[in-house]
Amino acid sequence: MANVTLRNVRKTYTGGFEAIKGVNVDVADGQFCVLVGPSGCGKSTLLRMVAGLETVTGGEIDIGGRVVNQIEPADRDIAMVFQNYALYPHMSVYNNMAYGLRNRGMAEAEIKTRVEEAARVLELTSMLERKPRQLSGGQRQRVAMGRAIVRQPKVFLFDEPLSNLDAKLRIAMRVEIRKLQRRLNTTSIYVTHDQLEAMTLADVLVVMNGGQVEQVGNPLAIYEKPATTFVASFIGAPPMNLMSTRSDEIKSQLGGSAAEAGVLGIRPEDFVITDQTPAGGVALPLTVEAIERVGAETFVYGSREQEDQRVAATPGELPPGEVIVRIPGTEAPTIGARIRVAAIRPKLHLFSGDGRTRLEA
């Protein structure tokens, strides 16, 4: 096991495109760190730099107290699991898991011990003689993880390993990966674009955007106190409602310095349908445009009567003038109904006009 430290890490490609812009991240020994962000944000590039598959233009990557910038991937004592299982189709499960160890010249008795132990942990013992074509997608992914486990590395690297699986299997494998990491207690860095996957897996969450780190911290802390409007709209499904504080409707309710903040954010679950306006809070009249019933809860999509200026759109952000409200159960107003929703002061999130700074509500 080992800690991983990224110090002002940069990656610039030929032509001057800067994919990674001075990233600083500390992953403690035994932690599960998740890099999350939209496509093109640089998360997979950063992971490949840790693995040694991409060169480092600037800064340092430290694994277990050793700067590895100039060290070959095979000598970094890491193991990587990819989106593509990359199993040898003509080999059995056992031989797929043993292949890397044999290439390193390990004794066959030690290989057998490691493969059988990994198979036991991953519940693959009964499948060791099967070929990959005889396995389901989830079983193939477990074999790929087993191939990484038998190396007993200091660090596991996961590059969107669940992307090829269907929704039900993704959930099951997500749970299995977390249980496995806790059992092995091996430092792990995991890349995903799925914020739900990120929230449920991570000890420490790194939210990336445009080659930079937007926020680092405990997943729940990031959800409850996003540092920027990008984080607010990316982390959480449905996304946070964001609106200008400078519209007369909101400005008059916030009052004081809060009214000059620039951007107001409210999570869908923090609204209630009510005729009352809470002291210090915000109430909005809406026209119901759509209803989504998903079982235990219902999403109400409404349009505001007066549209306002908004911050620049970010991935997952709601269209201008639209507000989404999450309510428990299946009871909901009818489409076309006029309703009033409100949120109390402690549930309000305020940001600067450019969306880059969180302010006190």
Curated annotation (Swiss-Prot):
Query: Which cellular compartments is it found in?
Result: Cell inner membrane
One GO process term, biological-process aspect: glycerol-3-phosphate transmembrane transport
Transmembrane segments annotated in the record for this chain? none
The record gives the membrane topology as: Peripheral membrane protein
Name any one GO molecular function.
ATP binding
Enzyme type, top EC level: translocase
Which InterPro entries does the UniProt entry name for this protein?
Answer: AAA+_ATPase (IPR003593), ABC_transporter-like_ATP-bd (IPR003439), ABC_transporter-like_CS (IPR017871), ABC_transpr_MalK-like (IPR015855), ABC_transpr_MalK/UgpC-like (IPR047641), Mo/tungstate-bd_C_term_dom (IPR008995), P-loop_NTPase (IPR027417)
- Keyword terms of this UniProt record: ATP-binding, Cell inner membrane, Cell membrane, Membrane, Nucleotide-binding, Sugar transport, Translocase, Transport
What are the binding positions for ATP in this chain? Answer: 37-44
Where does this chain mainly localize? membrane
Q: A Pfam family this protein belongs to?
A: ABC_tran
This entry's Enzyme Commission designation comes to 7.6.2.10
Q: Which reaction does it catalyse?
A: sn-glycerol 3-phosphate(out) + ATP + H2O = sn-glycerol 3-phosphate(in) + ADP + phosphate + H(+)
Which residue ranges does the record assign to the ABC transporter domain?
Answer: 4-235
Which GO cellular component terms are attached? ATP-binding cassette (ABC) transporter complex, substrate-binding subunit-containing
Source domain of life is: Bacteria
Assigned protein family: Belongs to the ABC transporter superfamily. sn-glycerol-3-phosphate importer (TC 3.A.1.1.3) family.
Q: Which NCBIfam families match?
A: PRK11650.1
Fill in the subunit field for this protein.
The complex is composed of two ATP-binding proteins (UgpC), two transmembrane proteins (UgpA and UgpE) and a solute-binding protein (UgpB).
Q: Explain the purpose of this protein.
A: Part of the ABC transporter complex UgpBAEC involved in sn-glycerol-3-phosphate (G3P) import. Responsible for energy coupling to the transport system.
Question: What is the protein's name according to its record?
Answer: sn-glycerol-3-phosphate import ATP-binding protein UgpC
Organism source for this protein? Bradyrhizobium diazoefficiens (strain JCM 10833 / BCRC 13528 / IAM 13628 / NBRC 14792 / USDA 110)
What are the leading ranks of the lineage?
Bacteria, Pseudomonadati, Pseudomonadota, Alphaproteobacteria, Hyphomicrobiales
